[in-house]
């Protein structure tokens, strides 16, 4: 008797693809719901809807961003092929802004820049997760591939600018209320506004590194993709 062959659904590659497909589908549904909700609210209430964007979709946004931390594990154990450090920088940016700045300071949640930031984040994520979800099942569309590799070029810098402006607008509130600051009985007390100011400078350094990495990755990917298209 020859060696037994496992059914397709028991093979590691199949299970990995099923898991990734479900993960991407959940993220796609979450970000689609957020963007659809924001769009409907804007057309229903106009500019007034921007002030309470966080109250309407903040919970789902926090869930989606929390789940996205799994991507670091995916890369570490090898089921995703992205590089760990650039993805770590991108996720860290969002976690700090969403949880450290917006969620922890109620006055910031009402700012219009929060609405703009959420729109930019969700535009990127909807395209990225749609492309990733279809790639797992072996489906490829040239237009979607190009969009997933190109949309970030104008939007990612806008995201960083919106994040920086969010931090800038939050500073007076953190300084006034002392949110997230720790007072100790010696000279090592932690003042959160100073941490944010330091992070504000690091944000643009991280943007340069991430943008350079993504641009190099885009050139390599599209070159290989164009060769495959010619051979089809």
Curated annotation (Swiss-Prot):
Any one GO cellular component localisation term in the record: endoplasmic reticulum membrane
Catalyzed reaction equations: a very-long-chain (3R)-3-hydroxyacyl-CoA = a very-long-chain (2E)-enoyl-CoA + H2O; (3R)-hydroxyhexadecanoyl-CoA = (2E)-hexadecenoyl-CoA + H2O
Single GO term (MF): enzyme binding
GO biological process: fatty acid elongation; very long-chain fatty acid biosynthetic process
Topology versus the membrane: Multi-pass membrane protein
Keyword presence, Glycosyltransferase: no
UniProt topological domain (Lumenal) ranges: 41-56, 134-135, 179-189
Top-level taxon: Eukaryota
Keyword entries, A-Z: Endoplasmic reticulum, Fatty acid biosynthesis, Fatty acid metabolism, Lipid biosynthesis, Lipid metabolism, Lyase, Membrane, Transmembrane, Transmembrane helix
Keyword Transmembrane tagged: yes
Catalytic activity, EC: 4.2.1.134
Short name of any one Pfam family annotated for the protein: PTPLA
Subcellular location, record wording: Endoplasmic reticulum membrane
Positions in the Cytoplasmic compartment: 1-19, 78-112, 157, 211-232
PANTHER family in UniProt: VERY-LONG-CHAIN (3R)-3-HYDROXYACYL-COA DEHYDRATASE, VERY-LONG-CHAIN (3R)-3-HYDROXYACYL-COA DEHYDRATASE 4
Subunit structure as annotated in this protein's UniProt entry: May interact with enzymes of the ELO family (including ELOVL1); with those enzymes that mediate condensation, the first of the four steps of the reaction cycle responsible for fatty acids elongation, may be part of a larger fatty acids elongase complex.
Chain's role: Catalyzes the third of the four reactions of the long-chain fatty acids elongation cycle. This endoplasmic reticulum-bound enzymatic process, allows the addition of two carbons to the chain of long- and very long-chain fatty acids/VLCFAs per cycle. This enzyme catalyzes the dehydration of the 3-hydroxyacyl-CoA intermediate into trans-2,3-enoyl-CoA, within each cycle of fatty acid elongation. Thereby, it participates in the production of VLCFAs of different chain lengths that are involved in multiple biological processes as precursors of membrane lipids and lipid mediators.
Family: Belongs to the very long-chain fatty acids dehydratase HACD family.
Protein name as it appears in the record: Very-long-chain (3R)-3-hydroxyacyl-CoA dehydratase 4
Gene: Hacd4
């Amino acid at each position: 008797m020859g060696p037994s062959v496992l059914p397709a659904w028991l093979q590691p590659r199949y299970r990995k693809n099923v898991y990734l497909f479900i993960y991407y589908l959940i993220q796609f549904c979450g970000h689609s719901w957020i963007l659809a909700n924001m769009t409907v609210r804007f057309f229903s209430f106009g500019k007034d809807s921007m002030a309470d964007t966080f109250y309407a979709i903040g919970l789902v946004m926090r869930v989606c961003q929390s789940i996205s931390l799994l991507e670091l594990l995916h890369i570490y154990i090898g089921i995703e092929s992205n590089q760990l450090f650039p993805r770590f920088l991108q996720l860290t940016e969002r976690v700090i802004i969403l949880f450290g700045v917006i969620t922890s300071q109620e006055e910031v949640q009402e700012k219009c820049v929060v609405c703009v930031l959420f729109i930019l984040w969700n535009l990127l994520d909807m395209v990225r997760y749609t492309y990733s979800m279809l790639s797992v099942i072996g489906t490829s569309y040239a237009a979607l591939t190009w969009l997933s590799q190109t949309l970030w070029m104008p939007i990612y810098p806008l995201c960083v600018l919106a994040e920086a402006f969010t931090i800038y607008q939050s500073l007076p509130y953190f300084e006034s209320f002392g949110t997230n600051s720790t007072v100790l009985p010696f000279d090592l007390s932690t003042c959160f506004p100073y941490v944010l100011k330091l992070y504000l400078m690091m944000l643009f350094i991280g943007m340069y590194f991430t943008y350079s990495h993504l641009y190099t990755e885009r050139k390599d990917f599209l070159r290989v993709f164009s060769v495959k298209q010619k051979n089809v």
